[in-house]
């Protein structure tokens, strides 16, 4: 690898070449070359603007743009020679451009610094990544709506403290994840707005003396706004931090969902089955069918949390404006985006294929006194204070534990020993269907409300 100072765009100041190890240590091309498409996009817009400003001739602009497009084709064909001694994606592309067209290629960087160039590239890249991720969230939500509609009448136990609490429908449970993902979607849309601001034109830190027209590049690159301060434009990475924060929340939701899927597929629950294509086996235990997809999503969540804390730590001690520290912003950002996108894709493929074991779910809901609250509410409607009803039902549950009977399995005489207000009509209240159907309000678990919520969800997705 060559380290001759003449290979560097900044070599004029230096009297000896960069140490070979330092060149490798400070280079970022191995990971930032994935920005090539956005780097070329930004350069094409910059060249177009320079021609309008009279810095380039139309012929020079056309020559630069045509060769940048050829360079992109070389990269995508795998024939581009990435050089570590050229440090990063920007200088590799610029050097290749100069190799192809000579002195005209050297004019491209007029009025621009790598500081505003890389900030622009990252924003363009992240904007596209957010769009892909939003599409995967929508696809997962579509799968949840389809499964929720199909399972609107399927009854399962709802849990608090992982203990049986009250009956719910499986469809209602699935829609809880739909709601969380809707907020994740909103957070990313909001993050995209702040990402979609153009720093190009900020140059190194103070702007440029050339008669640039930032409005032109802003429009060409599809940015919503132009950064209002050159120091801020090149130095802050709060948009990347905000993305990692939103990604962390989304991964936290997927991790919680993963935990439920892992539990539900276990022999102890047996609530659902996952198709073989989303599972793997054991190298020693022939009977095993392991839920690797949700387990890996649960595990990968920590990577995204780490990206967030890493970026916060990276930025916390930096003075204005740009510092080399910021070279370390890309790998955690790239990894967070890749992890969230792939996790969503895996879930969007897997969720519609979930096979609920309805009878097992129902049997589980019949255990654990899941209709105890319904009995208390029944007594309230008979005119008793809720706290008294709570205690009465507590005694009934204690009796059930001692006798091995659930509330619905007790006779009327057994129930009446706890309150004379209990009548024959109590048994309609104590059924699983009676329990879920009674919660017939917006946000409730009644099958009718589940179907209504599915329709609202479908309308929401159709409006995106």
Curated annotation (Swiss-Prot):
Compartment list: Cytoplasm
PANTHER family: ARGININOSUCCINATE LYASE
Chief location of this protein within or outside the cell: cytoplasm
Enzyme Commission number(s): 4.3.2.1
Identification of the protein by name: Argininosuccinate lyase
Entry keyword Amino-acid biosynthesis: yes
PROSITE patterns membership: FUMARATE_LYASES
GO cellular component, one term: cytosol
Family: Belongs to the lyase 1 family. Argininosuccinate lyase subfamily.
Gene: argH
Molecular function GO labels: argininosuccinate lyase activity
Catalytic activity: 2-(N(omega)-L-arginino)succinate = fumarate + L-arginine
